[in-house]
């Protein structure tokens, strides 16, 4: 069977054919995402191997802008199994994100508004490069989360009712 005919599983491929390695599902629940940006990452070799193996957790991650650079904090990348203890990386190492200067300036301006933060949304392969999709988000209140759940429940009920008829 040719490469075009092969099907990829639903959980590790996205619409545009990129292979998804990790996703921060809780971020879309906790934050209202106002804008997104695709960035590259500055990684060590053992970090790349661990990420390709799927041993990464974006859940508690956040980004800061320091000295005109975007830094990724609190993203846990497990140590690589086959590397020695001296050659392995630190799991919670601060990673630099790669973006154009104009994009960084735009993010900096949007962060000056009160209550906004930059959060990692998903980590995926684009060709042979590992990319991180970050989003500028505003934290949701508890009542906002409840309202959103009610809307989603009603949409789900309508969809189920339409399936029956």
Curated annotation (Swiss-Prot):
Keywords for this protein: Cytoplasm, RNA-binding
GO cellular component, one term: cytosol
GO BP terms, alphabetized: trans-translation
Cysteine disulfide partners in this protein: none
An example Gene Ontology molecular-function term: RNA binding
Annotated region described as Disordered, given as residue ranges: 1-21
Location(s), subcellular: Cytoplasm
Pfam family, one: SmpB
Gene3D superfamilies, alphabetized: 2.40.280.10
Keyword RNA-binding attributed: yes
Metal-binding found in the keyword field: no
InterPro entries named in the record: SmpB, SsrA-bd_prot, SsrA-bd_prot_CS
Role: Required for rescue of stalled ribosomes mediated by trans-translation. Binds to transfer-messenger RNA (tmRNA), required for stable association of tmRNA with ribosomes. tmRNA and SmpB together mimic tRNA shape, replacing the anticodon stem-loop with SmpB. tmRNA is encoded by the ssrA gene; the 2 termini fold to resemble tRNA(Ala) and it encodes a 'tag peptide', a short internal open reading frame. During trans-translation Ala-aminoacylated tmRNA acts like a tRNA, entering the A-site of stalled ribosomes, displacing the stalled mRNA.
Classification via PANTHER family: SSRA-BINDING PROTEIN, TMRNA-BINDING COMPONENT OF TRANS-TRANSLATION TAGGING COMPLEX
UniProt xrefs under HAMAP family: SmpB
Record family assignment: Belongs to the SmpB family.
Protein name: SsrA-binding protein
Native source organism of the sequence: Prochlorococcus marinus (strain NATL2A)
């Amino acid at each position: 069977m040719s490469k075009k005919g092969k099907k990829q599983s639903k959980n590790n491929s996205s619409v545009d054919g990129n292979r998804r390695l990790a996703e921060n599902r809780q971020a879309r629940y906790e934050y209202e995402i106002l804008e997104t940006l695709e960035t590259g990452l500055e990684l060590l070799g053992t970090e790349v191997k661990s990420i390709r193996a799927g041993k990464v957790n974006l859940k508690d991650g956040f980004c800061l802008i320091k000295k005109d650079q975007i830094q990724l904090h609190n993203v846990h990348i497990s140590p690589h199994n086959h590397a020695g203890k001296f050659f392995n990386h630190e799991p919670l190492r601060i990673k630099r994100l790669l973006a154009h200067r104009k994009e960084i300036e735009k993010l900096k301006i949007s962060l000056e508004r009160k209550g906004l933060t930059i959060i990692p949304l998903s980590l995926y392969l684009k060709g042979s490069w590992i990319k991180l999709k970050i989003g500028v988000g505003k934290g949701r209140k508890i009542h906002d989360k409840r309202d959103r759940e009610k809307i989603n429940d009603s949409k789900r009920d309508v969809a189920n009712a339409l399936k029956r008829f």
